[in-house]
Amino acid sequence: MHDDIKLVSGEEIVKPTGEVHVVYFSSISNNTHRFIQKLSVKNSRIPYELEEEINVDSDYVLITPTYSGGGEFTSGAVPKQVIKFLNKENNRNYCRGVIASGNTNFGNTFAMAGPILSKKLNVPLLYQFELLGTQNDVEKINEILKEFWGK
């Protein structure tokens, strides 16, 4: 689906330790927030307001929506709040994988934030889902996270 996906080899993947934890960003629409509430894992929300911040001190998987106009318009695919969060070295260093949401109406830029962040952070893109996700997406992500943590 995305031409610029960098495959992370098995040797490069750093498996997370500790409690299963997702860090996520959700816009005012709260689509991602509502999805996260269906997961059975510890979670931390990246604040919407750029002046606010959180610091993470344990391994996590990042879940983010995608912002972009579709087609050739991939600029701005990663929300500014996520970029600000990851600009802190400590937050960036604990990220072990990425899951992205998007809208299939935008064609080949569907969930584009996932491949962009996976490549930038050199972590695996674990899953992509549409908008609010389905019950199947919830079950699949719970399974992926449990397996990724080795639980």
From Swiss-Prot:
A matching Pfam family: Flavodoxin_NdrI
UniProt-listed GO biological process terms: protein modification process
Any one GO molecular function term: FMN binding
Family: Belongs to the NrdI family.
PANTHER family listed in its UniProt record: PROTEIN NRDI
Biological function: Probably involved in ribonucleotide reductase function.
Designated name of the protein: Protein NrdI
Organism annotation: Mesoplasma florum (strain ATCC 33453 / NBRC 100688 / NCTC 11704 / L1)
Gene: nrdI
